[in-house]
C-alpha cells in the first residue's frame, strides 16, 4: 500500500473517532424535569400496603386526589386541578395535625405527568404539613396497586 493512502485512511479514522467522542447521550441544553418533592417523600405501594395491613398499626391519612378507585381508608377528593376540589381538599386538612403522615395519590396516569399531584403537594407544603408522601405509581393505580392485590375501599362501588 502506498504511504499516502495509509496516511489518508489514518486521518479518516482519527477524524471519525474524534466526532464520536463529541456526542452526548442526552441532548445539550434541555433541563431535567424537577419536582417539588424529594425522593424520600415517595412511598412505594408495597410500603403503604404494609401500613394498611399491619395489626394495630398507626395509619396515615390518605387522600385520593384523582378520579380512580379509592385505596382502603382513602378520603376521596377528586381531581384537585379542578378549583372546587382543591378547596374541598383544603377544608379536609383543617383539623389534621401538621405532623400527621399524609399520603396523596391520583393513579390516573404516571404520577410524574399527573395534573393533580403537584397542586396537592404544593398546597400541603404551603399549609405547613411536614410529613407528606406521594404514592409512587409509575404507571397508574390499576397496574401499581390493584393488579398486586392491594386493598381497595369496598364501600365504594369500584
What are these regions (language model features)?
Residues 90-142:
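Catalytic cysteine-centered active loop of the rhodanese-like fold, especially the PTP/DSP P-loop
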Residues 70-84:
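Acidic/glycine-enriched edge-of-secondary-structure segments
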Residues 1-5:
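Positively charged n-region of N-terminal signal peptides that target proteins for export
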Residues 46-49, 81-94:
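Alpha-helical scaffolding within the catalytic cores
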Residues 8-9, 19:
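Cleavable N-terminal signal peptides
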Residues 32-39, 76-79, 107-111:
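Second-shell loop/turn segments in exported
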Residues 135-158:
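Extracellular/periplasmic juxtamembrane helices and adjacent flexible linkers that interface
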Residues 14-71, 153, 158:
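Flexible, polar/low-complexity N-terminal or interdomain linker segments that lie immediately upstream
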Amino acid at each position: 500500500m502506498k504511504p499516502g493512502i495509509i496516511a489518508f485512511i489514518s486521518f479518516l479514522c482519527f477524524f471519525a473517532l474524534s466526532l464520536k467522542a463529541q456526542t452526548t447521550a442526552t441532548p445539550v441544553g434541555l433541563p431535567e424535569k424537577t419536582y417539588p418533592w424529594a425522593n424520600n417523600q415517595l412511598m412505594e405501594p408495597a410500603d403503604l400496603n404494609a401500613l394498611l395491613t399491619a395489626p394495630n398499626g398507626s395509619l396515615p391519612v390518605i387522600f385520593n386526589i384523582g378520579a380512580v378507585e379509592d385505596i382502603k381508608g382513602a378520603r376521596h377528593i377528586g381531581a384537585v386541578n379542578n378549583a372546587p376540589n382543591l378547596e374541598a381538599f383544603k377544608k379536609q386538612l383543617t383539623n389534621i395535625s401538621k405532623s400527621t403522615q399524609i399520603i396523596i395519590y391520583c393513579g390516573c396516569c404516571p404520577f410524574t405527568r399527573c395534573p393533580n399531584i403537584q397542586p396537592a403537594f404544593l398546597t400541603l407544603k404551603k399549609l405547613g404539613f411536614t410529613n407528606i408522601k406521594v404514592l409512587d405509581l409509575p404507571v397508574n393505580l390499576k397496574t401499581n396497586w390493584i393488579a398486586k392485590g392491594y386493598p381497595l375501599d369496598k364501600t365504594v362501588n369500584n
